[in-house]
Amino acid sequence: MAYVNEQNPQFLLYNGMHNQTHSTPQYHNHHHHHHQSPTYPQSYFNPYSHQSYQQHHLNSDVNFQMVPQSTSVPPDPFCSIEPMETNVQAKEQILEEIVRECEEIERRSNSSASPASNWSSDEHDSQSEKSYHPYKTPEKKERKKAQNRLAATRYREKKRREKEEAMTCIEGLSVTNGKLKDQVSELEREIRYFKKFMTEMGMKTVTD
């Protein structure tokens, strides 16, 4: 019983808990005070088994120390990196899908634009042909033929005038060419005359 009252640091926690939870019993009978000893809960103290009490006290210390460790562990700063990377990858995949869809839409619109434009041009041509060739009566057909004959006659007359003008120009140029040739012949004749005159005057050495 002496080891319970000693100032052993291993029993400070137990003594404090015992003082808070179990107060020292008051003994009113002074006659039996020397015969009675303070009683303790059997679950915490056994005077005949100090080893089992010490083991129970150590286990309680271990449990008391492990509780704050489980709650005081700081969160891992890197635990949120993987979700962030996952979110970034998901956003990039969404953007890539949007870009591919836009390119596909643009490609389809470009591929469908050319047939549509061709169809519209063909339709416009057919409409113009219909407007140019409406349903004709025999009178309109004769009138159209007369207009075509008149246009052909005007075209042939125009070509004939152009041809006559060209021939007139050719004739004028031919006359001018003949005159120039005559002038050349006259100049050559005069050159020969002056050479002969200078030879007769003894000016041959000078001319040479």
Swiss-Prot record:
It is found in: Nucleus. Residues 140-163 are annotated as: Basic motif. It comes from the Eukaryota. Residues 121-141 have a biased composition (Basic and acidic residues). SMART domains: BRLZ. InterPro entries: bZIP (IPR004827), bZIP_sf (IPR046347). GO terms for cellular component: nucleus. The keyword DNA-binding applies. Residues 138-201 form the bZIP domain. One of its GO terms (biological process) is regulation of transcription by RNA polymerase II. Induction: Positively modulated by global suppression of translation activated via integrated stress response. Residues 173-187 are annotated as: Leucine-zipper. Residues 18-47, 106-165 are annotated as: Disordered. Keywords: DNA-binding, Nucleus, Transcription, Transcription regulation. Disruption phenotype: RNAi-mediated knockdown abrogates an increase in hydrogen-sulfide production in an mTORC2 subunit rict-1 mutant background. Residues 110-120 have a biased composition (Low complexity). Transcription factor. Involved in positively modulating longevity and stress tolerance, probably acting by positively regulating expression of transsulfuration enzyme cth-2, leading to increased hydrogen sulfide production and therefore increased protein persulfidation, a protective modification of redox-reactive cysteines. May mediate longevity and increased stress resistance induced by mTORC1 suppression. This is Transcription factor atf-4 homolog. It comes from Caenorhabditis elegans.
